[in-house]
């Protein structure tokens, strides 16, 4: 598991480099996803599946984000990030970048940072889908 304070610092610094990427809500959302999906980086590869990284992003989702994310290529260029699905397993900045880019694709805005339950429900709806095993709890 990655030290939560160090991870939060890296998340904040990375999100601030992405145009419109940082807010207290987005910082919390990335950390919540990382805690839930990979236990803060304990699992960087799904034990029985294709998902990779702290956000457990599947290669098909990665590729869809690059193809359909309106700001993905432009933001990657600004951050000098090259597209490479394998980086999801070992590059924390790339993982944070991809989580944020995926969240940018949702038309519904992130809830306020002071409403953790609403952020958890938002992530359940937009990250795991209502049909997945995860709950907002």
Go through the PLM ranges and name each one:
Residues 34-38, 102, 110-135:
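Acidic helix/loop microenvironments that form the catalytic cleft of cell-wall polysaccharide enzymes
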Residues 55, 136-137:
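Short beta-strand->loop
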Residues 24-25:
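GGW-centered surface loops in extracellular recognition modules
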Residues 18-19, 127:
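A broad structural signal for alpha-helix termini and local helix breaks/kinks
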Residues 1-15, 21, 32-108:
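Peptidoglycan-targeting cell-wall enzymes and recognition modules
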């Amino acid at each position: 598991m990655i030290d939560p304070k160090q991870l939060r610092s890296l998340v904040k610094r990375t999100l601030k480099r992405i145009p419109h990427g940082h807010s207290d809500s987005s910082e919390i959302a990335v950390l919540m996803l990382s805690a839930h999906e990979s236990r803060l980086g304990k699992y960087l590869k799904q034990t029985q599946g294709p998902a990779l990284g702290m956000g457990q992003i599947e290669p098909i989702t990665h590729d869809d984000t690059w193809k359909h994310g309106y700001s993905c290529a432009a933001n990657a260029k600004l951050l000098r990030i090259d597209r490479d699905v394998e980086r999801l397993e070992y590059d924390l900045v790339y993982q944070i970048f991809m989580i944020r880019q995926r969240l940018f694709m949702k038309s519904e805005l992130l809830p306020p940072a002071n409403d953790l339950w609403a952020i958890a429900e938002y992530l359940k709806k937009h990250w795991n889908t209502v049909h997945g095993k995860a709950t907002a709890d």
